[in-house]
A protein has these predicted regions:
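Short acidic/polar inter-strand loop motif in beta-rich domains
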Residues: 110-118, 244-249
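N-terminal secretory signal peptides that target proteins for export/translocation
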Residues: 1-9
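Short amphipathic beta-strand segments in non-cytosolic proteins
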Residues: 70-79, 202-218
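Start-of-domain marker
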Residues: 31-94
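Bacterial N-terminal signal peptides
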Residues: 15-24
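Glycine-centered loop-to-beta-strand initiation motif
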Residues: 88-91, 219-234
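A short, solvent-exposed beta-strand micro-motif common in secreted/extracellular proteins
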Residues: 104-108, 235-243
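Beta-strand-rich domain onsets/edges
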Residues: 31-46, 125-187, 192-197, 209-211, ...
Length: 272
């Protein structure tokens, strides 16, 4: 019994320090990289979901941390149910779901602070996200600081069931139809900010199979809507990023030169 306890304790300590190591070093290097939710099929009795951090749809799964979470909830037919998770959960989110429904799991992080190591990294980030006007107003004699927040969703279903989600996050991508319904050739979505459509805005579409990866950039229509053609064998990640100067209240709280909000939406049309 003592040997078993010692082995368990050693494994727990190793896992604990591994999570600290990953969080520390990745946070120093990623420069506000994308966060998304990705289905993990390791557990049979529950639906398990990884919190992934990386770029170009390649990332590292993180254990769950309540200190980093602002909101985590399941939305079915606009009925919201908070999801409670334990610190250190790995996979991060473990929940019992009825796949006959159209399930939307929503995760909002707290703000994280970042100071850039060099000006070029900030400029490249701004250019990539198509905020070129920032290049003419930022202070190039000072290393920029930034607070970033992520708003991430994953769609999970094994049926044609669908509902249109009402806006519940400050920055989000909302599904306008179901990617699991085979009669829908295109997946339609809407980008929202504080409950209002965000038109003429850049959205990056990532998709992948085990063999290949694809990326394209589109812009939403003036009404905030967009659409993409979907294929059953690909996993999809839609991403939108907004960079802006903090207002007076935000500046008092966040104390950074810039703020960025990241919205992501993932789904795999052939879950079933």
């Amino acid at each position: 019994m003592t040997i078993f306890k010692n082995r368990f304790f050693k494994k727990y300590i190793i896992f604990f320090f591994l999570i600290i190591f990953l969080n520390f070093f990745l946070n120093k290097e990623i420069v506000a990289h994308e966060l998304w939710l990705e289905k993990n099929s390791n557990l049979k009795d529950k639906t398990s979901i990884d919190i992934m951090i990386g770029q170009n749809f390649k990332g590292t799964p993180y254990g769950f941390s309540n200190d980093e979470k602002e909101k985590l909830f399941l939305d079915n037919n606009n009925i919201v149910k908070d999801i409670k998770q334990r610190d250190g959960n790995f996979p991060a989110i473990q929940i019992e779901l009825n796949d006959n429904y159209f399930n939307i799991i929503n995760y909002e992080s707290k703000y994280s602070f970042l100071e850039y190591d060099n000006i070029k990294t900030f400029e490249d980030f701004v250019k990539e996200q198509n905020f070129l006007d920032i290049l003419s107003i930022y202070n190039s004699n000072k290393l920029p600081t930034e607070n970033y927040k992520r708003f991430s969703k994953i769609l999970i279903s094994n049926s044609k069931d669908f509902f249109q989600q009402t806006s519940k996050l400050d920055f989000e991508l909302i599904a306008l139809n179901s990617p699991f319904d085979k009669s829908n050739v295109f997946f339609k979505f809407k980008l929202m900010e504080e409950g209002k459509p965000l038109g003429n805005f850049q959205v990056t579409i990532f998709s992948k199979t085990k063999e290949n990866f694809a990326q394209e950039t589109i812009k939403t229509k003036p009404n905030g809507e967009g659409k993409i053609r979907v294929f059953d064998d690909r996993v999809y990640l839609l991403s939108a990023v907004k960079i802006f100067k903090p207002n007076f209240i935000q500046n008092l709280e966040l104390k950074s030169d810039w703020v960025s909000h990241w919205a992501s939406l993932t789904f795999f049309p052939s879950y079933n």
